[in-house]
Amino acid sequence: MSGYEEKITSTDPKTRVFKQDTPSEGEFHGSAPCTSLPRPLPQSLPCTSDLLPPKKGQVKDVIGRVLEKSTKDSLRRSLTEGTYLGKEIFYLGNAWPGGSNQTDGETEILKTLAPDIFSRLRAYPIIWIFELGAGDSTKMSILLDLFELEGIKCYYCRVDINEELQKKNVRQLNKKYTYVECSGLLGTFEHGLAMAAAQAGKKVITSLGSTLLNLDNSQALKNLRGSCRDNNMVIIGHQGPEAMTGRDGEELHRASYHTKEYNKFIRGALRTGNEALGKEVFKAGEWEIGCAITPKGPWSHDFIFYHQGEERFRAFSSKKFNEQEVSDMFKTVGAPSPEIHRHPKTAMRIYVADCLGD
């Protein structure tokens, strides 16, 4: 693939897409390397009440104003200091667009994998499934449907920061299921993992769509370490870099990051930003959104926010680790080597590890 500059027609704001095929590691097209690392979202220490699971149909808020304040502070730093802007602001008021090649690949894997996972879990008297970054729960429903069909009770807790999406999906899931008790936790992955650790029974920690590991190496390891504890079964979906560098990379790259729906999702953060700041900082016509690719170490895609042609900050970085890199992460956190289930066309993989085995 050769480098190119392209402009995609859109509104509020315009979208400008940059891509370069062979920059050096850490270098971005059209500007100096970005060295500002994301600051971690402030965590309120879990108190006893925060660790109590939500009841069926409930969405329990354990972060509330902490998230609102930290998002506003992070946005202000990005505007004034040019620091990296984390992903929270994108998810707060916007639903993930869905329909990507990652979704297609994971769905195909889960159709085959879910019966095997179910057979391993069904004998446990208490089963908890915590999904980190649950979206609309469509993919996880492939597994939940089996519990319902066999009349085996389990508890399913969605962990997400989008309150509207949480309430909507918890309500819909409880209309669908009788044996699967569905609830929601309005909080970060760290909150979800702390709550999971406090529950009795067999816990399944799952995160699909590359959500858990799609971060810089240190944060990905932190998420994985928190997931691979006690007797947890871990189910993680992650797309490898060859999806973007192989024969169909050009097409898959566009399908992942440059669709009309995805563009709407990214632009939605600007509206959320205006609401958080209490004024119209992101004015239509003044801001453009570009992208930059680092092809290795690992493969990375970042969005660049320009104000009147000048780069102001970068955001929503997406990392793609290969099989060996992910396997090494499991080894680093002291977890068993994962099973790897593949969908070659989309380079999606689902990694499964049972932390205590059978």
PLM-predicted stretches and their roles:
Residues 346-358:
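Core SAM-dependent methyltransferase catalytic element
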Residues 190, 239-245, 293:
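Short "lid" loop at the C-terminus of a central beta-strand within the Rossmann-like core
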Residues 213-229:
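A short, conserved alpha-helix within the catalytic core of class I
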Residues 206-207:
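A conserved beta-strand element that flanks and buttresses the S-adenosyl-L-methionine
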Residues 2-130, 137-185, 197-202, 347:
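Rossmann-like AdoMet
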Residues 228-243:
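Conserved beta-strand signature within the Rossmann-like core of class I S-adenosyl-L-methionine
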Residues 248-336:
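Substrate-binding/catalytic lobe of Class I Rossmann-like enzymes that use SAM or dcSAM, i.e.
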Residues 185-192:
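Conserved SAM/SAH-binding loop
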